Amino acid sequence: MAAIADIIAREILDSRGNPTVEVDVTLESGAQGRAAVPSGASTGAHEAVELRDGDKSRYGGKGVLHAVSFVEGEIFEAIGGMDASEQLRIDETLIAVDGTPNKSRLGANAMLAVSLATAKAAANHQGVPLYRYLGGVYARTLPVPMMNIVNGGKHADNPIDIQEFMIQPVAAPTIADAVRVGAEIFAALKKELSAAGHNTNVGDEGGFAPGLKSAEEALSFITKACEKAGYRPGEDVTFALDCAATEFFKDGVYDLEGEGKKFDAAGMVRYLEDLAAKFPIVSIEDGLAEDDWEGWKLLTDTLGRKVQLVGDDLFVTNPDRLRHGIALGTANAILVKVNQIGTLSETLEAVETAHRAGYAAVMSHRSGETEDSTIADLAVATNCGQIKTGSLSRSDRTAKYNQLIRIEQDLDTSGRYAGRTILRG
């Protein structure tokens, strides 16, 4: 009765107005699952490939009709009739049918939509929430959010080189309280920026995108906003950065054009070390470029005992790249983006590999999102303790926070908010 009976795909829009793939999987029992895939702006060179049509007459070449046709054609032919609960077998079949090392033939967007929709259908067939279906009875940790309240880099049209400035409400007792704390600080930040004459338009991930001159200025505004909202930076709330350093790494140089600074790897490490000394920064993502393994080792040796160093473009949710990084002693955490690797099984393997090595895992959205809230369930299912899903505005971001609040209510007294347990040192 849990056999896959039908798969329907369609082209929908993401939060940037670009096409993406949505899939409905229906089982013989009548149970259904639906999933829509996200898309990134700053993408790692080693990510699985999302398939775009390239037809300039539609969506500027960004259409996904080829991916849709693969879902309803080759993919359905390959997995139709299979038991939806056999997730690993289904994902292995998808990988085999694609036949490429980076999922470039069928497209990671087509494969992931099917993989996630299948898991949701199986959960619905069993009558349990997705987080419980995937994580079992031990899925009970509500993650600390990394809330991106100031956007820069590729996520905004402003001079700030660093892509994301985030807050983490580590002292909140529950996820619902954490969301409230974040929303109050976000509102206070809007007032502070406006009073200083800055615009309060928001970027791709819902954070403000003011024309600030430096990372230090952005962090100073966030510090003031926390205090105005009644919270203590470093005690109630900690800070996190996503540098997306690959985006400003040119010809062996880290070129912070907005600040007028250029560094080699050692200089970039000193720059980040200085910021972490001035502000309560407890997590830095992609502080160095995706293939600068030597620089990453220096960063890890310098800051790794007290700061969480997250590999996003460095690891691209790929268990093999993660294992390589672990062997070299680089970074101490992985950012988990389901569309970077293209199947649910490989995503879960990446989290498991990280945890076995003592690395933290942070479940993450992409800058081009939809109303799909699957990553909220995945964060709880894996007990990863942290989630990165944007600011406190734009419904594509708040959908994930709202789902976490629902999960917390569902867990009742068995749920626990990760809080300060995520901190190093």
From Swiss-Prot:
Cofactor(s) the protein requires to work: Mg(2+)
**Any idea which positions bind Mg(2+)?**
242, 285, 312
- Co-factor binding comment: Binds a second Mg(2+) ion via substrate during catalysis.
SUPFAM superfamilies assigned to the protein according to its UniProt record, in alphabetical order: Enolase C-terminal domain-like, Enolase N-terminal domain-like
What keywords sit in the KW lines? Cytoplasm, Glycolysis, Lyase, Magnesium, Metal-binding, Secreted
Which GO terms of type biological process are on file? glycolytic process
Where does this one sit in the cell?
Answer: Cytoplasm; Secreted; Cell surface
Catalytic EC class? lyase
Q: InterPro entries in the record, alphabetically?
A: Enolase, Enolase-like_C_sf, Enolase-like_N, Enolase_C, Enolase_CS, Enolase_N
Enumerate the catalysed reactions. Answer: (2R)-2-phosphoglycerate = phosphoenolpyruvate + H2O
Listed under GO cellular component are:
cell surface; extracellular region; phosphopyruvate hydratase complex
Q: Which residues bind (2R)-2-phosphoglycerate?
A: 163, 337, 366-367, 388
Pathway(s): Carbohydrate degradation; glycolysis; pyruvate from D-glyceraldehyde 3-phosphate: step 4/5
Active-site residues from the entry: 205, 337
A Pfam family that the UniProt record links to this protein: Enolase_N
Q: Which GO terms describe its molecular function?
A: magnesium ion binding; phosphopyruvate hydratase activity
Q: What is its EC number?
A: 4.2.1.11
Which branch of life, at top level? Answer: Bacteria
Q: Which HAMAP family match?
A: Enolase
Mind telling me which PANTHER family this protein's record contains?
Answer: ENOLASE
Q: Which family does it belong to?
A: Belongs to the enolase family.
* Protein function: Catalyzes the reversible conversion of 2-phosphoglycerate (2-PG) into phosphoenolpyruvate (PEP). It is essential for the degradation of carbohydrates via glycolysis.
The protein here is known as: Enolase
Q: Lineage, please?
A: Bacteria, Pseudomonadati, Pseudomonadota, Alphaproteobacteria, Acetobacterales
